[in-house]
Amino acid sequence: MSIEIANESGADVDTDAVLAVARHALDEMGVNQLAELSVLLVDIDYMAELNHRWMGGDGPTDVLAFPMDEGSVDHGPGENAAAGAEPALLGDIVLCPEVAAKQAVTAGHSTADELHLLTVHGVLHLLGYDHAEPEEEREMFALQARLLASWRSTRSR
C-alpha cells in the first residue's frame, strides 16, 4: 500500500503516526494492498480556501476527503489484493492541524489524538462512508471508534 504524506502546515506533526493510523484503517477495512492514498497537512488559510472552493463552506474545516476511484476499491474482510489486481487510487485526505488543535481542546484530548481521528474519518469518506443522515452517522462514527480503538491497542503493546 502506498501512502504519501506532505506536511505543508508549518505545525509539528508526527507524520509517522498519521501514516500508521491511515495504514491500519485501510488494512482493517480490507482495502487492496495496491491502493494509493495521499495525506496533506495544510495551514488554516489554505484549508479555508479549499473548503470554500470544493465544499462551498465558509472558513476552515478539520478534514476534507477527495476520492478518486470511489466505488472501485475493494473493502471488506478478505478482499485484499488479488494477483494481477490494478492499483486503486483512493484519493487525497487534507488535514488542518490548527483546526484539529482547537477541536482537541474541546474534546479533552491531544492534538495528535484528534489528527488520528480525522485521518480515520477521511479514510472512511474515501471508502464511501458518509454521515449526512443519522443512521449513516451512527454507522460511520461507530466504525471510526472501532478502528481507532484497535489501532491504539496495537500501539500499547
Curated annotation (Swiss-Prot):
Which Gene3D superfamilies does the UniProt record give?
A: Metalloproteases ('zincins'), catalytic domain (3.40.390.30)
Q: What does the note accompanying the cofactor annotation read?
A: Binds 1 zinc ion.
Q: What is this protein called?
A: Endoribonuclease YbeY
Compartmental location = Cytoplasm
Similarity annotation:
Belongs to the endoribonuclease YbeY family.
List residues traversing the bilayer. none
Q: Does the keyword Ubl conjugation apply?
A: no
Q: What domain of life does the native source organism fall in?
A: Bacteria
- Organism of derivation: Salinispora tropica (strain ATCC BAA-916 / DSM 44818 / JCM 13857 / NBRC 105044 / CNB-440)
